[in-house]
Each structure stands twice: as C-alpha cells, then as structure tokens.
Amino acid sequence: MQFSTFQTNLDNWQGASLIFGVLEEEIASQLENIKFVVDPKLLLKKVTQKKFKGEKGKTLSFEFLDQKLETLIIVGLGKSKDLNKSDIENSIGNLVRKTVDKNAKISILLPWELINSQLEITKLAESARLSAYKDNRFNKKKDEKKVLKEIEFLNLKQFENISFEETAQICEGVELARKLVAAPPNSLTPQEMSLQASKIAKDHGLEVKILEAKDCEDLEMGAYLAVAKGSDLDPKFIHLTLKSEGPIKEKIALVGKGLTFDSGGYNLKVGASQIEMMKYDMGGSAAVLGAAKALGAIKPKGLEIHFIVAACENMINGSAVHPGDVVKASNGKTIEINNTDAEGRLTLADALTYASNLNPDSIIDLATLTGAIVVALGNDVAGFWSNNDDLANDLKAASAQSGEKLWQMPLQKSYKEGLKSHIADMKNTGPRAGGSITAALFLEEFFDSEIKWAHIDIAGTCWTDKNKGINPSGATGFGVKTLVQWIKNK
C-alpha cells in the first residue's frame, strides 16, 4: 500500500471514494470545499434532511452522487476548539476499514488548516493504513474483494513537501508483528521465526546470529533450555544487530519473549486459560522483530541496536521440565520451578543475561508475561517497570507520541520475599497478589544493575477480539511503534 497527495487543481482530480471531514460549525461553507465532485447546494439539502451537524464521530454516506465519484463519506469532527488528533485518527481509521473492501484507492480531505504539523499528517496516514490491514494468508478461498492499494490526501497545500516514506516503514514493521502473532503455531515455529529474522537481516543489512541448542548449552542457558526441552521442535536463539555508520553514541538491546506456543507444560492450561490462543505468547518477540524491520529501513544514526529473541515452545513430553525442578540460568543463579506455566520469565532470564553481557546502555524487554497485568490495566494499556527514571520518562514520551498506551508500575522491593526458595536462589513465581510485579522483580535478577532497564508486559494489548481504534480484530502489533519512536527520539 502506498500514500500519495493531490496538490494541484482539484477540478482535475479523479477518484472513486472520498472521505470528507467537517466540523460541527457552519456546514454550508465547508461543503463548498468539495464542489469539485458534487453540487454543494444539493448536498446541503441531503445533509440537512439527515439532521447531520458534524458532531464528533457521526458519519453520512452517499453513493453515486455524481459521475465523478462513487462514494462520499462525510465524517463529523466535532467543534474546532475540542479537536483531538487521536479522535480524528480513530474516526478516519474506522471509515477506511469500512470501505477497504470496496476500493483500490481511498482519498481523504480534511480541514488541514487545523492540523499543526507534518507529524500529525503522517500519524493520520499511519492510522489509516493500519486500520485497513487484512490478513487472508490462511483462507482457502482468498478474498476476492478489491484490495486497498493507495491512500491519497487531497489539498495538503501547507505540507506540499511531506514524505510518507518513514510512515510506510513503521507500518510495515507493525504489519510484520501482526502477521507473526496471528500465525498458527504449526506455521510459526521457532525455526520459522529464525527464518523471518534472517530475512529482515538480509533485506536491511543487519548482522544475524542464530544460536542452536548446543550453542545455548555451551553458554549454560539452563533456564531457557529447561523450557525448550519439552518440545520436539528445536529452540532457536535469535540475535540481530543494527549498527549505524560512523561513531556509536549509545548501545541498546531489545529483548522479546518468543514462546511460539505455550501449553503451560505440566501445569497445563485448562478451563478458561485460552490454550487455543497461546500462539500469541510470542507477542514480545514479534514487536522486537517488527521494530528491527522498521529501524533497519529507517537506519537511525549513532546507535548500535541488538534485537534478541529466545524462541521455543513450552510443551509436554518425557523430557519436559517438572514442577519442582531446579535449573541454573546463564548468570549462575538457580531457580526452583514451582510453576511450569511461568515459562516466559525463564526464557527471558537467559535472554536478559545474554543482552547484559553485550554491555548495552539500555535494555528493554517486551513480553506477554502475566494475566495479572490484564486484571490490573485491561486490554488497552500495557504496564511497564523500570529501574531508571530517565528511561521511564523517555518511554512515557514515546508512548504518548506513538499512541500505544503505557502505565508505569512499581518495582516494589518488599515483594521479592515472595520469590524466596528453600532450596534454590529463587522461585520462578510468587504469590498471586502482585503477580505482574513479582514477575518484573524476577527479571531484574538477570542483568547488570548498572544497566538502564525497562520491562513492558503486553499480555493484554497484543490481541483484540474486535475492531478497536486503528486495530482490526486480531493481532495488534503493539510495541513496535513505541520502540521505534523511542529510538527516533534519541
């Protein structure tokens, strides 16, 4: 899909579908802005008959108004003094999603004089494209409806030199993350994930290293391998590196949980545990690889960025880890496994240790780690923890810019008491209360304390069961935009 603009005389414009935004003010004068496709007086009569006043979120749709236009959708933006860019993005996104099956090209005309910057225009374009996303890979009969190939913005006079190249690159990263999360577990195996990572490296000039089980044994990754050995599929430890040309001012590691399927192990997921949805337990790794794809195209300057994923399945066989086993992570700490369904933190323990040994300035990990964070924050907001105020504030800023909502949670040190073990250095789970916090405290044990670190729990935000905002039902690709924005802000 591409973005385009039409800046010349609108009388020469040709198109089939137009989305036109109006304010909750003098409608008649605003309708003059589309006289190039329809008689504004005739349209005003129809709008008046429908008692449409431009209220926020209200829409009117007209078919075949003129030979020059097949569909006109008028969307209310509310009062100019209350204009909110997020509301505009969601409104346009919803409309694009509703018309995506009907048109190869959708054109958009808004009161651009109320848009403050090129950034707001590109964010609108991003929302429109991500709202139009469809995944038909696994349908026997492919969707025969029209495929949206172009989103066009009309009359962007004050932004005539605008570029959507970076916007498209970010969208491609989000779309990759969505595809990875949505893929069934018999399709997206650890092997396939490593192939996807290798393709990113080849396409964008990143270094790639795939560690096999023997390599991980040599590095004494006992926690990661304890999870992986219950599956007949070999684990793949993925490490991509993006190095800017010229002097490196900062080194960063992005770590993603990569459970391509989680049965729960011997603490088997039963009842309402949604075992059938555990293909999305690699949502953190999808965000990291999506960010790698986007950043590989954007090529930020002065940075060395490491993308790390410990990919495997959590399954049951004769070799699977038992509840009560004690394993040793690659930093030498021993862990009593009191719950095999708290496996993500075990894989992350060795992934974080590996990242720490690279001596980065910052580490950010993303994981669908706990149900507790969903209970705490629901499905619209991800929780995050950090050991550094500057990093936390930078993430909050990136979150606000990207539109992906984060909420900082406490690293309550007294809760570490719940992780104490009588036979090992620690247990892998604490009591039910404060479960997302004790999970973060567990992870904090596996990297150098001098490194700035943040952990983002995306268990509630990586999937939506229904269309919501810019996200069609299914995988959201949550985390890609925030990671990319955080990097861009440096």
UniProtKB/Swiss-Prot annotation:
CC cofactor note: Binds 2 manganese ions per subunit.
GO molecular-function term, one example from the UniProt record: manganese ion binding
Claim: Protein biosynthesis is one of the keywords in the record: no
Positions bound to Mn(2+) 2: 257, 262, 281, 343
Its biological purpose: Presumably involved in the processing and regular turnover of intracellular proteins. Catalyzes the removal of unsubstituted N-terminal amino acids from various peptides.
KW Hydrolase (keyword) present: yes
UniProt-recorded name of the protein: Probable cytosol aminopeptidase
Entry-linked InterPro entries: Leucine_aapep/pepB, Macro_dom-like, Peptidase_M17_C, Peptidase_M17_leu_NH2_pept, Peptidase_M17_N
EC number: 3.4.11.1, 3.4.11.10
Residues involved in Mn(2+) 1 binding: 262, 341, 343
EC top class, as a word: hydrolase
Highest taxon, organism lineage: Bacteria
Coarse class of the protein's main subcellular location: cytoplasm
GO cellular component, one term: cytoplasm
Organism, scientific name: Prochlorococcus marinus (strain AS9601)
Active-site residues (renumbered): 269, 345
A Pfam family hit: Peptidase_M17
Keyword list, A-Z: Aminopeptidase, Cytoplasm, Hydrolase, Manganese, Metal-binding, Protease
Intracellular or extracellular location(s): Cytoplasm
Annotated Gene3D superfamilies: Leucine Aminopeptidase, subunit E, domain 1, Zn peptidases
Biological process, per Gene Ontology: proteolysis
Catalytic activity: Release of an N-terminal amino acid, Xaa-|-Yaa-, in which Xaa is preferably Leu, but may be other amino acids including Pro although not Arg or Lys, and Yaa may be Pro. Amino acid amides and methyl esters are also readily hydrolyzed, but rates on arylamides are exceedingly low; Release of an N-terminal amino acid, preferentially leucine, but not glutamic or aspartic acids
NCBIfam families the UniProt entry points to: PRK00913.1-4, PRK00913.2-3
Cofactor(s) required for function per UniProt: Mn(2+)
Family, similarity comment: Belongs to the peptidase M17 family.
Gene name of the encoded protein: pepA
